[in-house]
């Protein structure tokens, strides 16, 4: 709902801003539940809250989604994951851009789960787990045709032919 006549919304004068966005967190929760309740076969819904929850605020959005039942959250970068961890201590937080070389310790410290986007990521994560002395969670990201992130067809075929590449 836009505020007018100088009404304040979050410290913003709507007359000067041109428009003010009001986020209905109850609607966000209802939408999550709607999707989640339609899933079958053990599938679960996740919440993508990258880029400050697409500009609506990672803290309020994530807390609302957690209250609605979300347990898996995705962010783009590790710094977003660290911020999210400050709001949700028990959530599973996945980082779509993975653990960049040298950032692995932060993943362990903050309980972040990297997406492995190529076989090089898998090898680096495997080496870090060996150094840490224990297996650590990760997810495998496969490019589904958008050509952004994830194993391409050739790498995917290599993994299918030799699953030990992910050991």
Descriptions of predicted regions:
Residues 2-17:
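N-terminal amphipathic/basic leader segments beginning at the initiator methionine
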Residues 13-15, 19-22, 27-29, 43-167:
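Active-site-proximal beta-alpha core segment in soluble small-molecule metabolic enzymes
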Residues 38:
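Conserved PLP-enzyme active-site core in the AAT-like
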């Amino acid at each position: 709902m836009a505020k007018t006549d100088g009404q304040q919304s979050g410290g913003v004068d709507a007359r000067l801003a041109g428009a003010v966005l009001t986020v209905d967190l109850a609607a966000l929760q209802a939408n999550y539940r709607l999707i989640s309740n339609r899933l079958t076969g053990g599938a679960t819904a996740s919440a993508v809250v990258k880029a400050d929850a697409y500009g609506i605020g990672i803290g309020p959005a994530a807390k609302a989604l957690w209250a609605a039942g979300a347990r898996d959250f995705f962010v783009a970068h590790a710094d977003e994951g660290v911020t999210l961890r400050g709001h949700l201590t028990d959530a599973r937080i996945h980082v779509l851009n993975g653990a960049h070389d040298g950032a692995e310790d932060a993943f362990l410290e903050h309980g972040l789960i990297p997406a492995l986007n190529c076989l090089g990521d898998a090898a680096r994560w495997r080496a870090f787990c060996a150094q840490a002395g224990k297996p650590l969670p990760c997810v495998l990201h496969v490019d589904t045709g958008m050509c952004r992130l994830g194993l391409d067809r050739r790498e995917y075929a290599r993994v299918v032919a030799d699953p030990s590449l992910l050991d």
